[in-house]
Amino acid sequence: MQTTNLSYILGLDLGIASVGWAVVEINENEDPIGLIDVGVRIFERAEVPKTGESLALSRRLARSTRRLIRRRAHRLLLAKRFLKREGILSTIDLEKGLPNQAWELRVAGLERRLSAIEWGAVLLHLIKHRGYLSKRKNESQTNNKELGALLSGVAQNHQLLQSDDYRTPAELALKKFAKEEGHIRNQRGAYTHTFNRLDLLAELNLLFAQQHQFGNPHCKEHIQQYMTELLMWQKPALSGEAILKMLGKCTHEKNEFKAAKHTYSAERFVWLTKLNNLRILEDGAERALNEEERQLLINHPYEKSKLTYAQVRKLLGLSEQAIFKHLRYSKENAESATFMELKAWHAIRKALENQGLKDTWQDLAKKPDLLDEIGTAFSLYKTDEDIQQYLTNKVPNSVINALLVSLNFDKFIELSLKSLRKILPLMEQGKRYDQACREIYGHHYGEANQKTSQLLPAIPAQEIRNPVVLRTLSQARKVINAIIRQYGSPARVHIETGRELGKSFKERREIQKQQEDNRTKRESAVQKFKELFSDFSSEPKSKDILKFRLYEQQHGKCLYSGKEINIHRLNEKGYVEIDHALPFSRTWDDSFNNKVLVLASENQNKGNQTPYEWLQGKINSERWKNFVALVLGSQCSAAKKQRLLTQVIDDNKFIDRNLNDTRYIARFLSNYIQENLLLVGKNKKNVFTPNGQITALLRSRWGLIKARENNNRHHALDAIVVACATPSMQQKITRFIRFKEVHPYKIENRYEMVDQESGEIISPHFPEPWAYFRQEVNIRVFDNHPDTVLKEMLPDRPQANHQFVQPLFVSRAPTRKMSGQGHMETIKSAKRLAEGISVLRIPLTQLKPNLLENMVNKEREPALYAGLKARLAEFNQDPAKAFATPFYKQGGQQVKAIRVEQVQKSGVLVRENNGVADNASIVRTDVFIKNNKFFLVPIYTWQVAKGILPNKAIVAHKNEDEWEEMDEGAKFKFSLFPNDLVELKTKKEYFFGYYIGLDRATGNISLKEHDGEISKGKDGVYRVGVKLALSFEKYQVDELGKNRQICRPQQRQPVR
């Protein structure tokens, strides 16, 4: 079912894990005339949901740990082979085991000759436990708490070794750590027993010297040299050329590498960007800085370490009424926030001044090119030697040495130094970055694509660093191309990007917190409203609550007249009105900050004027003065006060600002589609990114209710609204609102009126895209039989029922990935695995009551068990609080952890089968049919890693060794991955939904409704047994949720 003759607008609603889409047909004037198709695409967000961390972070850390362990093991292997070649140790010695008093032997080696096996044990112990070695002088100035604790421990122990009490780290460990604390090694989370590797090297050299003096024949120079190399070798940090390979090239100068963030030019670019973009709101008017103000500020960040908004206010001599645009005044002491901080500039200055090189700094500060070289060197290179080599012959050695003690830079920007040096002179003149780019390069985003294509090309990953955004845009591209294949090229594309898209996890949490605060305030207002109007028959509507909130914000006064508002008459028709202070027809501003509660009698003649115009602010009338005093004395936010006191408005600029989403993601996608995708609309610009507030307004005025929590269909609802927000629709709404503002009584009495400009008849009803719009949209989005219902409910709109009408089916992106974590991190003892039991050591600070009940030897140590139980009860079963102070047995021995038993029916054997870890995730489930019954074979990541294709199917409530073998009598049907679409028929029920996962204990699978409808199953999820199912099929579904086909039988695929 394809068509290429359709003229349509494609509407998209993009979220962090969803793409809602709608195809809306338009006429020759590009007015929306009908809904052709609609749908939703759901996918997993590209981050860890609970923490917002990158999905790759845990794998990267685990990989780093594995490499560290592998390098240590390889180092020990090299040492053992060398000691065997030198005749110090034999294979038998290594098999039988070396002496385990290595710490004592290291001290004894200073006093007597060690035997060959003792000497070998000492050398291997030093190679294995070789402390920490820093490659940078300034590493102690880190913000990393863990690294700071490690360096503190290293420094403290180094200081102790400078005294005459301890000759070597081993002697310090025995005489101090073991004696005073009862242990030598670091305990959980502590680094107080960590040594500097250079101190261990000194111990190694001293041991060789002493053993040579005692006549040990295994102290030859080449042995000492080789052991020293093993002790001190460290993989070089990624530096210089290696970083450049990963760095990427400039947005504009394609052959140039990106510039370091801490170069002078990069910091100057950031400063000029902030300076030239700074906007001040005063008397409601918005303005940029003039040249005199720019010159007042331009050198200030170089003179002081930070420039705050409060300092900017003082330097510019701004009035109390003036505020800074985009600064959140809801926070306490908002203007104490930093406006600009030149971190690299002041870091270099302080480093030189602290070493007595103030004059040198004053000379260097006049040389931007040298400062660029310094910023580049300390960002690219990670060892003192490499940095010194790069800067030699560029800056004096005294400067290099001073900087090495203090500087540690990283991070790069998207522009190169070559590009910056072209752009900065124009920005010095006050031009914005985009203006400078257009003048130099002809385009803001780099070289523009001169040729569009019918399908949208892949999203350039190098330009979108945020993985969450990149996944959303990539999924949106798939949807766009699928729609184009079905319906041909669109005339226009309208895109709404969710407020959270492009925000960091922290910012999204702040938005969520703000929304929760707003919800709390609304709920409080609802409660107060109900208490005040106890005879109110129904639940208060949003408009009722809005009136009440505005009443409280305005101290119960009409802002236009200053008269008291009788709170008991708030619900009385015709008594008060909610007015757009700045007329909606001129601004399209429907925000809370543009709404005031006024007496209806005072609002009759305002029309579509601003308060400044209506109250004759131009001549500073008494009415205007009273209005200003009432606004300034209200509880309105600073931004709202500015809005209400606006004196001059540029209608086109206001409308453009309030209609269009100007955030980076919206701008990027808009430009990318405009430049790369063939659009057949008649306008020059056929991509529109509406502001989310406008979408919410239209959705509300068109009577479309968005229930986010119930299911995923609401994304489609927004996409339809976005598609219908055409320029012509905006004009119709503007004319209607203007008519309503000027002639409110005619709207109330449902009179029609002729627009004097266009001659068009203005309906007394809020404009809709087409007749029966609300009913048709609700049927298409929410009804499972739209064709039938459309015929029954909308007989007067037969064109609503066409060949493309079908139930909305949410498409979900399946997860085919088979790599990942092999097993869970915790390793348990496997000694009793044959009994189905593993033993785990649990720190007391994590000992919950249920774990205590499974304590090993509970019957043999009743006093210990009773003591632990009593301590937990004393602190309300909170182990962290209960064992914050040490716990001792009756004999005085401290207990830090206990062993507990756990049921272990399966797992992964590790550490030469001495340990067992729980399985990680099931990445694939293979479905078989045998004797007319269905069987499920789970495949885990560790099996994929080892190339094992398991053949045992789950038997409910049985151990894995009792599972059923899928032999020649079993037939493979298909493989299931998360979010695969399946159809399941049992004797009693029918399921058609997405596969979520498998319960290996019961053999049941979990299925989710395609739209996530929470009223079905248990929160939208069904748990179903498949063994006795009548039929079980897997389906393939396209990105649009339209083409759903049974997967054809295929051979079982290997895991690797």
From Swiss-Prot:
Gene Ontology molecular functions: DNA binding; endonuclease activity; metal ion binding; RNA binding
HAMAP family xref list: Cas9 (MF_01480)
An individual GO BP term: defense response to virus
The protein's required cofactors: Mg(2+)
NCBIfam families associated with the record: cas_Csn1
Record protein name field: CRISPR-associated endonuclease Cas9
Binding-site list for Mg(2+) 1: D13, E496, E500
Keyword field: Antiviral defense, DNA-binding, Endonuclease, Hydrolase, Magnesium, Manganese, Metal-binding, Nuclease, RNA-binding
Ranges of residues in domain HNH Cas9-type: 504-659
Catalytic activity, EC: 3.1.-.-
